[in-house]
Amino acid sequence: MAKSEVVNVALITGGARGIGRCIAATLAARGMAVMVADLLDTSECIEQIRGGGGKAMGVRADMADPAAAKEAVSRTVEAFGRLDILINNAGMHPQGRGWPPLREMELEFWERIVRANLTSTVVSSRAALPHLSDRRAGRIVNISGGGPWGPEWVSTYGNVAGRGPYMAAKAGVEILTRVLWEEEKDRGIAVTCLRPTIRIALDYEREEIRARHPGPEILMPHLLWLLSADPTEVGGRAFEFDGERLSAIPYLS
């Protein structure tokens, strides 16, 4: 693939399945070259994109590990010649209602959830920033987990008890969005955040769940808007999507 053919290049973390996979396919369908990074096998996602005529490569990487994140970014630039967009989607939310309360929670469990959801965003961003600032038009979109703030959380998981590490990590992602924007805006990097507050049915979930809830495709028009909007309009802000409207979250506006 000739590097001169590439116009926009995106690195999507946590892109092997779910929301990340949908993001990768959506961006590739619009002519972008995408690098899909995930701890999971990315081959199925890459084959899907290439089958539709898109440009894509995959890398198995723990994006909370600095060396692995740096390698993923380096492979992106080596393959496509540049890096314009980082989508921080990597994360983990153990399923079920059996999470322990904080007084009983093992510190290792807390650290594992925070590492997957918040540390990965920090580490991936640090690895990508030098290349994004080279473009002076770089974009970072952080995907926050909206469930704990949305009305469907209780009906799905019972309540927020026991969800401390996940909720703290995702709130941290939103605050980090503001911090990164303030630190990097003079280098031309726009940093923003998307928080879905509705239940999103993912491609690996049971059929009955996918029949009841919208898929990640419902988020894509809003993600594309965040990638194209004036940086002064979206930079440092988190936007929540409630299934009908996209609106700025007041405490980050």
Can you describe what each PLM-predicted range is?
Residues 3-35:
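Canonical Rossmann dinucleotide-binding motif of NAD(H)/NADP(H)-dependent dehydrogenases/reductases
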Residues 7-8, 54-55, 82-83, 97, ...:
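Active-site loop of short-chain dehydrogenase/reductase
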Residues 60-72, 107:
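The beta1-alpha1 cofactor-binding region of Rossmann-like NAD(H)/NADP(H)-dependent oxidoreductases
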Residues 93, 141-172, 177-178, 182-185, ...:
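Catalytic loop of short-chain dehydrogenase/reductase
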Residues 97-102, 106-111:
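Substrate-binding pocket helix/loop in short-chain dehydrogenase/reductase
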Residues 125-126, 178:
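A short, exposed helix-loop element centered on a Lys and neighboring polar residues
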Residues 186, 193-194, 209-253:
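C-terminal helical subdomain
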